[in-house]
Every structure is written in structure tokens, then in C-alpha cells.
């Protein structure tokens, strides 16, 4: 568990793949407590990454800090930037993807809807292609909305599944999903200072073959 920043209000860390963001046995808050050497530490989840996704996250160290960070997320003042490697090449080097998505709870999957309806929500993201190699594209992503599996579904539905995707792709890639929480930015809940934290993906496939 890599800790990037610690103070009395927040902990910024790098979430490993296959770890839940929520506070349960083996979840990220428990791993943070172990890293801090304090099994009773107050560590609270304020935003989530899918279990299979890795990268930078912030956790609150009090109810007050959690409330303030959650407010920033609700009011779209919390910045999140992702990196992904997808199969194929987007039509444009930069653009916006907009879809209607709904959650199939029985199958535990997010699906693209053809028309508005009950449980259907708009999903919007901005992307920019950073580089290409071997019919793969590395993209930078900013979410305008935060739907479950949004990035994964929006690219997969256009024939560009993320490398390592298991749920929304039939391709068999020899790696974890290539979706990485690259950068976060938020106003510190105590000091009021705006802070940003970033971490590059590990140099493993497919990140190792695409600059």
C-alpha cells in the first residue's frame, strides 16, 4: 500500500487492483489502517474505484472531512483524471462521449439504453488520445458524470474495450484492466487549500509498450 500524503484530515493513497474501496475486511480503509499502524484509525471512503481498477484515491480521517469532500464531489468541484489503454483507435483524437446508461442489477452490468426511461441516466466523458502503439490507444479521460462502469461501457460499446477488460469484452488480455486513476484535485477540508496528487501507472503491460 503506497501512501502519497497524510495529515490529520485526509490520506491520499494508491489503491491496488482487486481491492474494494469500501470499509470491509480486506477493503481499502483496512489496508490504510494497516499502513498507518493503527487498527482503530477513523478512515472513511468518500469516492470509489471499481474493484479491478487501481490508482490515486483520497480517504477522510473524520466525519467532518468526509462530509466536506462528499460535498465537493456532489457539486462537481472534485477533480478526477483517468488514464486508459483501449483496443483500437478513436475516430477523433479528442472528443466527448455521451450515452444513456442503465444498471442491470441481476447481471451486475451497466448497459447502453436506446431511449430515456426508468433507471436510465445520461453519461458524459471527455477524452484525449495521448499516444498509439500496436493498435492500442492511450487516452486521458475526464468524467462529467460518475455512473457505474461508465468509462468501461462507453468505450466498449464503441468497439474499443479497455485492455484487460473481462466484463464488457470477449478479448483475453494477459493483464489487469488498463484503467488508472491518474490525478485527483480537491480543496483541503480543513485548510481550504486546493491540492492535487498524481501517480503514473506501473510499467507493466500494456502501459509498458505505449508512451
What do the PLM-derived regions correspond to, one by one?
Residues 1-10, 16-22, 144, 148-211:
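Pseudouridine synthases involved in rRNA/tRNA modification
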Residues 1-124, 131-134, 178, 204-209:
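RNA pseudouridine synthases
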Residues 129-132, 188:
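Short, low-complexity Ser/Thr-rich regulatory SLiMs
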Residues 134, 139-142:
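Short histidine-centered loop motifs in beta-beta connectors
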Residues 87, 141-144:
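A structural micro-motif recognizing beta-strand termini
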